[in-house]
From Swiss-Prot:
<protein>
    <recommendedName>
        <fullName>tRNA (guanine-N(1)-)-methyltransferase</fullName>
        <ecNumber>2.1.1.228</ecNumber>
    </recommendedName>
</protein>
<dbReference type="GO" id="GO:0005829">
    <property type="term" value="C:cytosol"/>
</dbReference>
<dbReference type="InterPro" id="IPR002649">
    <property type="entry name" value="tRNA_m1G_MeTrfase_TrmD"/>
</dbReference>
<dbReference type="GO" id="GO:0002939">
    <property type="term" value="P:tRNA N1-guanine methylation"/>
</dbReference>
<dbReference type="Pfam" id="PF01746">
    <property type="entry name" value="tRNA_m1G_MT"/>
</dbReference>
<dbReference type="InterPro" id="IPR029026">
    <property type="entry name" value="tRNA_m1G_MTases_N"/>
</dbReference>
<dbReference type="InterPro" id="IPR016009">
    <property type="entry name" value="tRNA_MeTrfase_TRMD/TRM10"/>
</dbReference>
<keyword id="KW-0808">Transferase</keyword>
<dbReference type="GO" id="GO:0052906">
    <property type="term" value="F:tRNA (guanine(37)-N1)-methyltransferase activity"/>
</dbReference>
<keyword id="KW-0963">Cytoplasm</keyword>
<dbReference type="InterPro" id="IPR023148">
    <property type="entry name" value="tRNA_m1G_MeTrfase_C_sf"/>
</dbReference>
<feature type="binding site">
    <location>
        <begin position="133"/>
        <end position="138"/>
    </location>
    <ligand>
        <name>S-adenosyl-L-methionine</name>
    </ligand>
</feature>
<comment type="subunit">
    <text>Homodimer.</text>
</comment>
<comment type="similarity">
    <text>Belongs to the RNA methyltransferase TrmD family.</text>
</comment>
<keyword id="KW-0949">S-adenosyl-L-methionine</keyword>
<keyword id="KW-0819">tRNA processing</keyword>
<comment type="function">
    <text>Specifically methylates guanosine-37 in various tRNAs.</text>
</comment>
Amino acid sequence: MWLGVITLFPEMFRAVTDFGVTGRAVKNGLLELHTWNPRDFTHDRHNTVDDRPYGGGPGMLMMVQPLRDAIHAAKAAAGEGAKVIYLSPQGRKLDQQGVTELAQSSRLILVCGRYEGIDERIIQTEVDEEWSIGDYVLSGGELPAMTLIDSVSRLVPGVLGKQASAEQDSFSDGLLDCPHYTRPESLDGVDVPAVLLSGNHEQIRLWRLQQSLGRTLLRRPELLQNLALTDEQTTLLAQFVEAMNKHA
């Protein structure tokens, strides 16, 4: 996957290129990330990248000319078919379904705003989609961009050691993940569930599915409203609720 990022702080993206899963993906040639800094497209000696908004009010906007030139440079490097995304609190909220959709694109250009945002005409003429990572205020679009890159890259074939790792992540099937355990078998008197030590793969599968269903019901019940549960899932969830009520 090819990624271009428009940002005033390109050094922040070393967190993507140099570390963890995404860093390995870059090293292995599965992920290609380039940055364009609007400051490199300024024409004054101060490298000005902000400007006052029409109509007054507090704060500044990103200056149109350097930002637009940076976007054009990224588009030229990406070639035809690149999707331009502006990270914005007004955009569609990112969820696993959205991540799956974005992962179908081979080339993405992410525009990271700063200050009070960017000129609306840039959004109208240069941006294909707006995406948000949540209903809260951040200082810029860099952290949302890194969040999007990390989540999307996990679905790029070969990035994870095993595709099952992505398939078993929370939200991959619309449910929260089940609990996980490692050694020791007993920790401060709390034992690993016996079924996980049984070696019975079918029973382990059913237990994990039931725990995912139950955890989703208890912590994010609204997620279940969007799912068409199978007969197996419905039965397992009913058994979970029954057991929970017995121990209430």
